[in-house]
From Swiss-Prot:
Protein task: One of the primary rRNA binding proteins, it binds directly to 16S rRNA where it nucleates assembly of the body of the 30S subunit. With S5 and S12 plays an important role in translational accuracy.
Disulfide bond annotation, renumbered to this chain: none
Gene of this entry: rpsD
The keyword Metal-binding is assigned to this record: no
Keywords: Ribonucleoprotein, Ribosomal protein, RNA-binding, rRNA-binding
Subunit structure: Part of the 30S ribosomal subunit. Contacts protein S5. The interaction surface between S4 and S5 is involved in control of translational fidelity.
Protein name: Small ribosomal subunit protein uS4
Protein family per UniProt: Belongs to the universal ribosomal protein uS4 family.
Amino acid sequence: MARYLGPKLKLSRREGTDLFLKSGVRAIESKCKIDTAPGQHGARKPRLSDYGSQLREKQKVRRIYGILERQFRNYYKEANRLKGNTGENLLVLLEGRLDNVVYRMGFAATRAEARQLVSHKSIVVNGRVVNIPSYQVSVDDVIAVREKSKKQARIKASLELATQREKPTWLEVDATKMEGVFKRTPERSDLSADINEHLIVELYSK
């Protein structure tokens, strides 16, 4: 499946919630009618079956993190293989992606922008350039903006914007140095309560 390149707000309207696909400079409610489905008439969303709800939740999470279907399924398989709660394991794996960590640290305004920074070799992990967005960050890893990329206006703007967001407690960031440390693995209570990972587990368990 190809990566979606269409209007980002359309995806948020389809899921009925902010997927954080835009920078967040303006509230999403000021940009679109988030509580109505996309389309000319913005029809009300029909009541979903159990399967429909499970599928929608999977699509929502997949779109939040910008993951393709095959990648997402592989993450689920890995989460299921690990000890502990499969749903929580899935979210932890997604949060540990380098592009997500770059976004969480405030070096990028969106995960898509973070993915681009990583792919363009603007990010170093423990002093070495890593250009794989799906790279799994480990505890105590130091993630930083590459020296020659620190002058990029979009990175400076993103760090300024990040001051308006809640700071993740599992990360330690020095905005002046443009670097941060992955202090610990996030717990479920650290992550969004708007995600129902149990529905995803039910979907893939069939």
